[in-house]
Structures are given as C-alpha cells and as structure tokens.
C-alpha cells in the first residue's frame, strides 16, 4: 500500500483558552483529492492553516512526504512542496499579474522561471491577457485564478485550497474548479476546503466532515449521500455551480 503523502494525527489547535480542533486525524493518498467540509466555524480553515504551518498545533502531529512538519515554519513547508492557497485570495493586489507570478517562482532556478510562468498562464489564458494589469483591479474570479496559478507555478506536490469559491458567482467558481481538476490530472494532490459541497464531492476521492472542531464523518466521497450531508452540514450545503447557472460575477 502506498504511504500517505499527508498524514494528520490527533491534531488539537487552541486560540488562547478556546479550542478550535479536537483530535483531528486525516490521511491523504498521493494524487488524490480530499474534500474537507463543514459549516462556518467548524474548523476547516484552522485545519488548513495548521497543516501549512501558519497556526501552531497544541497537540498532535503532521507528516508530509514522510517527514514530520508539525513545528516547521510555513516557508519551509512551502519549499518542501506543500502550497497553501488562503481563503480570500492569495495575491499581491498592488503588483501586476506577471509580477505576482514572478514572485511566486522567485525560489525556482532562474533558468526555470520563464517556463513556470508560461505554464501558469497556459492554465488560465485570461491572465496572459491581463499580464500588465494590477492584480487588485481584476475581477474576483480572475484574482482567484491568479491565486491558483501562483500556487501551481511552482509544481507543488500538494495544494491546500481553502474556500476558493468564496464570494464567486457559480459560473466563475466552476472555472476555478476546472483549474483544480487540471492540477489533479497532472498528478498534484489536493486538499479542498469548500462551500460548494456537491461540486467538491464530485471532484473528491474521499471526504472529511468537521463539526465544531471534531471529525463528524469520514469516508469515500461517493458514500457521502444526502443523508450524511443533511446530518452533518445542514445549511452549509450550498448549491452546485451548475445548479446556479444564471449566477453573475
């Protein structure tokens, strides 16, 4: 059996006297997509940030690519091939699109940087058309495409995408999902924290549902039927992008 590329074991996270995660465990196989679902405040973003080294766990262990990264700083984890795309756009709004991409690949070998930027633009051609435009002046959907392009430009082993469709119209969100699908087809492992529950489950191989910081349910994505969704998510179950085809940016 292939060893997990990412393993979270009995993870606790506290913010002062308030505990956000309680003994959360998760195993992610290489090349798969795991959907992390839950209502607002369930702990999805806390889990993502703890894995990425942005929030220190109070207990538990995180292993990535065979190495314990529990206490590693975020920049070191990123260099190991784990890229985190934060909720609310991971871009530099006062830099141009192309400068955002240049910043993303700054740690790559100089000779490899042009090809890395070209690959990123190939995934989202609209970014090539906006290359000299300030990132902050892009539409919300274009900003999220840029955030994803920045993450994928460095050819990561694993991407944690935290609520990438947040604030986007369904049709625009679908273009972001297509970018994630493309990344998955290229062999990149994805941990997807998402509000579009059904669309996330369509894309995912497995699913973990958080409820108030605890693991409420885990299993194959195809087994997360409506009963499971209603029981653990309730009002958090947002409609699919396809079901809101008339949505506007």
What is the predicted function of each stretch?
Residues 134-138, 142:
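Conserved ABC ATPase signature
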Residues 16, 72, 97-115, 123-125, ...:
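ABC-type ATPase nucleotide-binding domains, specifically the catalytic core motifs of the NBD
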Residues 60-67, 80, 113-117, 217-219:
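Conserved ABC transporter NBD signature motif
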Residues 214-236:
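Conserved beta-strand-loop-alpha-helix hinge in the C-terminal portion
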Residues 52:
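Helix-to-loop junction immediately C-terminal to a conserved catalytic motif
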Residues 37-39:
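The feature captures the beta-strand-to-loop junction immediately N-terminal to the Walker
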Residues 151-152:
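ABC ATPase C-loop
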